[in-house]
Amino acid sequence: MYVRHLGLRDFRSWACVDLELHPGRTVFVGPNGYGKTNLIEALWYSTTLGSHRVSADLPLIRVGTDRAVISTIVVNDGRECAVDLEIATGRVNKARLNRSSVRSTRDVVGVLRAVLFAPEDLGLVRGDPADRRRYLDDLAIVRRPAIAAVRAEYERVLRQRTALLKSVPGARYRGDRGVFDTLEVWDSRLAEHGAELVAARIDLVNQLAPEVKKAYQLLAPESRSASIGYRASMDVTGPSEQSDTDRQLLAARLLAALAARRDAELERGVCLVGPHRDDLILRLGDQPAKGFASHGEAWSLAVALRLAAYQLLRVDGGEPVLLLDDVFAELDVMRRRALATAAESAEQVLVTAAVLEDIPAGWDARRVHIDVRADDTGSMSVVLP
């Protein structure tokens, strides 16, 4: 798989750009702040419908405009597929697949399969659980695009249930007992969609675990052994496959956990149980990586998580596109060499670098130089001829 064309309109610092890309390695070179990462961000957005840098879409739209457009043409096994994504201010985002409108932007997920390495990856080890949940969900969505709808529905139900919890004090004051019947309805919906999301995550962690261990050993052969696990906000012992029985069991356990925390939830007005409270546990030896890993160990583990994702996607069928956003500058010589070796088999590798010296020696790559120019609305990124 490779991206043949990337077009941007009013995306971040890019007013207008059309890039013809090729299989193999391409390096986008330019000083920091010139818009290199914005190209990688656009491709990652096309992969997951989300940015790796911000949680909202608004910052992706160029200042002074009301919409951004990302256009890609992806070649997979000789077949071309065109995707256009429109990110709008105050409106629902839109998508087109092969120039035809689709019902939901989620319908284009899976066209581009990519793995992203970025400086923000250190947050997978040292950051909050939300960073690790997003890593799992993004990978699950790339592998099984239907998970995007599962997560979206869970988040919708979670918002509704949270709003209902916050309304309970007022309902009690008015003597309205119907709110508790409504809460039970939302409990059932939360359990249904939450169980499906948890089952997908557990299955993914089980497949990732041996790959993370192998990748970490490659990157840090003298360090402790790496391991990962899934920590849920409820009892999940037992299920390991994504069968209907497992999802039903998880839903029952989630309902039981909601009932057990009901008083605390009503008191605090928040949902205390569910996949939005879960975490991916990372360990080095018998210690948690967060708080105990050195800087080098943390980087090795973060890269190992991405390499494990890359390996799973390869096993699924087809080489995913590798997106390396200024990551070589963050790694020492040994880890840089290990990542470069892993990337050798990829059909397409797209890299950003502030200076060419950040690229591993001996890499044969096309170079695209990025600059900035001023216009009436400020500065904008451009590709040098």
UniProtKB/Swiss-Prot annotation:
Give a GO biological-process term.
double-strand break repair
* Disulfide linkage: none
Name the PROSITE patterns on file: RECF_1, RECF_2
Which segments cross the bilayer?
A: none
Keywords (alphabetical) are: ATP-binding, Cytoplasm, DNA damage, DNA repair, DNA replication, DNA-binding, Nucleotide-binding, SOS response
* Pfam families referenced in this protein's UniProt entry, alphabetically: SMC_N
Q: Where in the cell is it found?
A: Cytoplasm
The positions annotated for binding ATP are 30-37
GO terms of molecular function: ATP binding; single-stranded DNA binding
Whether Secreted counts among this entry's keywords is no
Q: Which GO terms describe its cellular component?
A: cytoplasm
DNA repair listed as a keyword: yes
Family per record: Belongs to the RecF family.
What does the function comment of this entry state? Answer: The RecF protein is involved in DNA metabolism; it is required for DNA replication and normal SOS inducibility. RecF binds preferentially to single-stranded, linear DNA. It also seems to bind ATP.
The cross-references to PANTHER family, in alphabetical order and at most eight, read: DNA REPLICATION AND REPAIR PROTEIN RECF
* Protein name, as recorded: DNA replication and repair protein RecF
State the organism of origin: Mycobacterium tuberculosis (strain CDC 1551 / Oshkosh)
Q: What is the lineage of its organism?
A: Bacteria, Bacillati, Actinomycetota, Actinomycetes, Mycobacteriales
